[in-house]
Amino acid sequence: MSAQTSPAEKGLNPGLMCQESYACSGTDEAIFECDECCSLQCLRCEEELHRQERLRNHERIRLKPGHVPYCDLCKGLSGHLPGVRQRAIVRCQTCKINLCLECQKRTHSGGNKRRHPVTVYNVSNLQESLEAEEMDEETKRKKMTEKVVSFLLVDENEEIQVTNEEDFIRKLDCKPDQHLKVVSIFGNTGDGKSHTLNHTFFYGREVFKTSPTQESCTVGVWAAYDPVHKVAVIDTEGLLGATVNLSQRTRLLLKVLAISDLVIYRTHADRLHNDLFKFLGDASEAYLKHFTKELKATTARCGLDVPLSTLGPAVIIFHETVHTQLLGSDHPSEVPEKLIQDRFRKLGRFPEAFSSIHYKGTRTYNPPTDFSGLRRALEQLLENNTTRSPRHPGVIFKALKALSDRFSGEIPDDQMAHSSFFPDEYFTCSSLCLSCGVGCKKSMNHGKEGVPHEAKSRCRYSHQYDNRVYTCKACYERGEEVSVVPKTSASTDSPWMGLAKYAWSGYVIECPNCGVVYRSRQYWFGNQDPVDTVVRTEIVHVWPGTDGFLKDNNNAAQRLLDGMNFMAQSVSELSLGPTKAVTSWLTDQIAPAYWRPNSQILSCNKCATSFKDNDTKHHCRACGEGFCDSCSSKTRPVPERGWGPAPVRVCDNCYEARNVQLAVTEAQVDDEGGTLIARKVGEAVQNTLGAVVTAIDIPLGLVKDAARPAYWVPDHEILHCHNCRKEFSIKLSKHHCRACGQGFCDECSHDRRAVPSRGWDHPVRVCFNCNKKPGDL
């Protein structure tokens, strides 16, 4: 701390002499003030004193021109806060202490101390110096806020307008490691919320847009960073405004409140309305019921290094009046905060979520409004870190993102609030049981975390949904609840043996613990109902997107078809190569002379699509080149090639050039004549066989539809793959997932897995999504 004193520093305070006389005689000019030594010190005394071990860490300041020390007696007493200590007016040379006016009267107004010699400080110079310092500080603060701009944080549809943490920090224009708090403002539309923030934090600059028109100028949630107080300031949309999506916008306010450390409720009414107390009371109840749990989960899910307090923010009710007195003016003995609590109690609202509620009022006889009292109250609360500590901006963004992801989605008109600002319907799952109509009690979007629906009451049976569940009676009596389903065969039977047993003794009910507990045709007569003997029935809720619970899982017919298809497909795949080779050779033998041989056609002559082994190649009857089906789907007469007046297959180019006759010589026509007759005969035979195959396909489709399990989507309703949305065609076959029953292409359903809940105990086809589900299907 000590240093050589320059000549310029000497003579700054010629009236202030060293008060220690430790290394001098007390005649040297004071250069330092040590608050812990309670004295002014010259350079030599300061250096010699603070070489000692016990005095080495004392805080010293270098004196400025016109410096006046603090009073030594009243320093630190209750009632004097740091920064408002009394300055001394005299120094007692005998007692060697500095005294303010009050302490001098109290201690030196009588007795021998009255005759003690004193040194008077120049207080007028001090006042001018302090005013200059305050002016400099005010100018510095204004300069810090000159470049502050606000940005849209969340729009009116509850969608966050910043992409990630880095984008949020960049728009705030603060350091990533800066610790800050969040201050937000609420109130009715037109009460001057944006104007209040501009004058309280930004010295009147229009950081948040204001407007004299009737339309609200603040739509959604806007944010800005105050570098002076190191807070993120959030401006919100006003209540009671003429807006659409009112329910979603009201829910958005509670998300902002949940991430705030300090909330200002701005009201410009001559008397406090009930809307204020109802809003804060309902917000407190919804915060405790829905948000505290989610904020705790956010801490664990996002790996936040700062705990999010379950206590809500502090609230300041900023009340501006014109014609009426402020709250508590007619009851000087009662503080306004107690009157506020009484109003809450009368309305049956209990704001337990908020850490504290404060009242700050101002009466505006003549504009402009005085915001200094609000600013001082805010600064005191921001310094209090007992409940809510400052945190990194990334933590604030993660909390807002987690709340937005959880509590999002449209709110139906029939769930609009009538008696409460924040009804449960704004935050709970909107799914209703299809059987009894009861709503789910879980939070919104709980399905993303794998949490199933749950209702407060029991369900009733509906024949339409068959919402029964069988549980093994023997396991239930042992204290376990094990669900069982009727199915074709036991898990220990092979597929073909299971079909044989099913044909003889009917379906089975198998328990994982007890094995096969029931067969429907175990005896020739006298078979009892399983509900009376081995299972118990429970009625469960039917939520949207789920199937019935005891639908017919007897899939014997489908298993038989699957087995036959597997064998037929295997034989077909083994014989595909030789069959195609023979077909191509035979086609080339009877093809006209101008046709390009199949062996030379490797890709479509127009779109250049490469042909696979099982793809069909088509010849244009006009030019003779090879094409795919889509590039040669048109027909027209080609008499110049000997095909007569009947329309035949041609490529797209020849179809468009149909008015241009090809120059074909008579020699060419004679040469093609013999092979053309052979080709016509071949096509006639092929068309006849194709008609027979089509006639066989129709009853085969009926058989497949009859064998389809009840939970499968019918083939005629499946137009595209349920996962990749590709449209089905002759080349793209339909496949059913044995778990969900939806239609998929082969690429999206190539996994194999047992589905015991549907009666498939051996690995069968399942889709990509069902295969990702944990546990048994």
Curated annotation (Swiss-Prot):
Changing K617A: Drastically reduce PtdIns3P binding. Abolishes PtdIns3P binding. It comes from the Eukaryota. PROSITE patterns: ZF_FYVE. Coiled coil: none annotated. A zinc finger (FYVE-type) spans 598-659, 715-775. The keyword Ribosomal protein does not apply. Zn(2+) 1 binds at C604, C607, C628, C631. One of its GO terms (cellular component) is autophagosome. GO terms for biological process: cellular response to starvation; lipid droplet formation; macroautophagy; positive regulation by host of viral genome replication. CDD domains: Bbox1_ZFYVE1_rpt1, Bbox1_ZFYVE1_rpt2, FYVE_ZFYV1, GBP. PANTHER family: AGAP002036-PA, ZINC FINGER FYVE DOMAIN-CONTAINING PROTEIN 1. Interacts with RAB18 (in GTP-bound form). Interacts with BSCL2 in a RAB18-dependent manner. Interacts with ZW10. This is Zinc finger FYVE domain-containing protein 1. It comes from Homo sapiens. The gene is ZFYVE1.
